Amino acid sequence: MDEKLSRVDPKLLELLVCPLSKGRLSYDREHNELVSEKARLAYPIRDGIPIMLVSEARRLDE
């Protein structure tokens, strides 16, 4: 994976929130996802773009 695509700008993380819980997100570098612990969802990052759709998120209990 391209190194630039595997990083998330910390300023972006400060602005983005989970669309379901409105809670903070953390970056999971191993899975390249933004994680909402509150909603127990992980949003994928594809081609450097966070996909902030609940329908595209992975449940953390899976």
From Swiss-Prot:
GO cellular component: cytosol
Gene3D superfamilies, per database record: 2.20.25.10
Record SUPFAM superfamilies: Trm112p-like
Superkingdom classification of source: Bacteria
Family, as annotated: Belongs to the UPF0434 family.
Cross-referenced HAMAP family: UPF0434
PANTHER family reported in the protein's UniProt record: PROTEIN PREY, MITOCHONDRIAL, ZGC:162634
Protein name (database record): UPF0434 protein RHECIAT_CH0004260
Species for this entry: Rhizobium etli (strain CIAT 652)
